[in-house]
C-alpha cells in the first residue's frame, strides 16, 4: 500500500508541475498572440502591396497557430487533463498550410505538402467517427 500511495503522490505532483508549465506556456502564447496582432496591424498599412499581402497571409496563419495552441491548452484543462487528438491534427494542417504559403517555389514539395494535408484530413475524419470519438 505504501508503494501505491507514493506512486499516486508522485503522479499528483508531476501533474501539478505539468499544469503550472502549461499555464506558463499559455501566458507566453498569449503574449505572442498580442505581438502578432500588432504585427498584422502594421502589415495592413504597408504601401508595398506584393510583399504586404504575402506577409499579411503568413501573419494570419501564424496567428491561427498561436490561437490553436492556446485552444489546445484550454481544452486540456476542460477535458480533465486530456489532449484531444483532433486539435493536434488541426495544428498540423495549419502548419503545413503556412509552409505552403511561405515556401511554394518547388512544385513537387507543394504537391507532397498537399498530400500530407489530405492524409491529415482523412485522419481527422477517422478520428471523428463514432468508433474512435471520445467526446
Curated annotation (Swiss-Prot):
GO biological-process terms attached to the record: cellular response to phosphate starvation
Protein localization: Cell inner membrane
Entry keywords, A to Z: Cell inner membrane, Cell membrane, Membrane, Transmembrane, Transmembrane helix
InterPro entries, per database record: P_starv_induced_PsiE (IPR009315), P_starv_induced_PsiE-like (IPR020948)
Predominant cellular place of this UniProt entry's protein: membrane
UniProt keyword Ribosomal protein present: no
Transmembrane segments: 20-40, 54-74, 82-102, 107-127
Pfam families cross-referenced by the UniProt entry: PsiE
Cellular component, GO, one term: plasma membrane
Topology term for the membrane: Multi-pass membrane protein
Family, similarity comment: Belongs to the PsiE family.
Protein name (database record): Protein PsiE homolog
Lineage summary: Bacteria, Pseudomonadati, Pseudomonadota, Gammaproteobacteria, Enterobacterales
Amino acid at each position: 500500500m505504501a508503494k501505491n500511495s507514493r506512486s499516486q503522490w508522485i503522479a499528483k505532483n508531476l501533474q501539478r508541475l505539468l499544469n503550472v508549465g502549461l499555464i506558463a506556456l499559455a501566458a507566453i502564447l498569449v503574449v505572442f498572440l498580442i505581438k502578432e496582432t500588432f504585427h498584422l496591424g502594421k502589415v495592413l498599412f504597408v504601401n508595398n502591396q506584393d510583399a504586404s499581402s504575402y506577409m499579411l497571409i503568413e501573419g494570419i496563419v501564424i496567428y491561427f497557430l498561436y490561437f490553436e495552441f492556446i485552444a489546445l491548452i484550454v481544452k486540456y484543462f476542460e477535458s480533465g487533463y486530456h489532449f484531444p487528438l483532433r486539435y493536434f491534427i488541426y495544428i498540423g494542417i495549419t502548419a503545413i498550410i503556412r509552409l505552403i504559403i511561405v515556401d511554394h517555389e518547388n512544385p513537387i514539395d507543394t504537391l507532397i505538402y498537399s498530400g500530407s494535408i489530405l492524409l491529415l484530413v482523412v485522419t481527422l475524419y477517422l478520428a471523428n467517427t463514432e468508433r474512435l470519438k471520445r467526446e
